[in-house]
């Protein structure tokens, strides 16, 4: 069996899961907690193995998260590839010869961690039925961005609110982004340029603050009231 036209998309963080597509149609979609029986479980390892029930080869592994694979996903001993690339390689879903090893990026693996809010916008837009729309995303912490404060110290910023212009079939552009940080940060308001791994550089309006954003405020209140798992 050597099927082609398959894309395996995985989400790494809480509520981790996998979705297998064949020529743009969903073959299966499942969260890791269905295998592990642990609510909201991360690391969709069992979900990736489930792919073998449908195909022994995929054309691409697409990874969604808020932080990049190379720095945060853990490493396979000796070869140095991240654990998700390593699992796909060892299961022979992707080519075992795709990299020179020792941490190199596999050409069949696509890390979309730098556009986390845009992925949320895409999910909303493609399920909406609209040909054109504006998507507003409010999130606890989207993509992690390295920033420098007024003292030129390195701090981490997080996407907290974003606005996107969406047009079918595949034009989703950033209009506005609010980035927050837990560190001391001078308020910034104005244009900024960031790279999209799919479409290249993007220019949009942004504000950077030392505030957590709407969603984290809501989360703090619900946690205080005991509305947790």
Across the structure, where does each feature detected by a protein language model lie?
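Short acidic/glycine-rich loops and adjacent helix/strand connectors
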Residues: 1-229
């Amino acid at each position: 069996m050597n099927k082609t036209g398959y894309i395996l998309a995985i989400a790494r963080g809480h509520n981790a899961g996998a979705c297998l597509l064949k020529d743009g149609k969903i073959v299966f979609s499942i969260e890791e907690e269905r295998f592990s029986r642990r609510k909201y479980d991360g690391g969709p390892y069992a979900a990736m193995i489930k792919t073998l029930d449908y195909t022994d080869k995929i054309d691409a592994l697409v990874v969604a998260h808020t932080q990049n694979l190379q720095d945060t996903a853990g490493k396979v001993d000796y070869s140095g590839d991240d654990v998700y690339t390593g699992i796909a390689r060892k299961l022979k879903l992707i080519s075992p010869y795709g990299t020179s090893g020792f941490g190199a990026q596999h050409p069949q693996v696509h890390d979309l961690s730098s556009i986390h809010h845009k992925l949320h916008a895409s999910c909303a837009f493609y399920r909406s039925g609209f040909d054109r729309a504006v998507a507003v995303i409010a999130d606890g912490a989207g993509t992690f961005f390295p920033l420098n404060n007024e003292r030129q110290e390195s701090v981490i910023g997080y996407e907290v609110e974003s606005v996107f212009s969406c047009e079918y079939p595949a034009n989703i552009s950033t209009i506005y982004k609010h980035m927050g940080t837990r560190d001391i940060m001078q308020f910034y308001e104005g244009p900024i340029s960031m790279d999209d791994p799919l479409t290249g550089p993007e220019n949009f309006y942004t504000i950077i603050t030392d505030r957590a954003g709407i969603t984290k405020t809501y989360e703090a209140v619900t946690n205080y009231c005991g509305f947790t798992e």
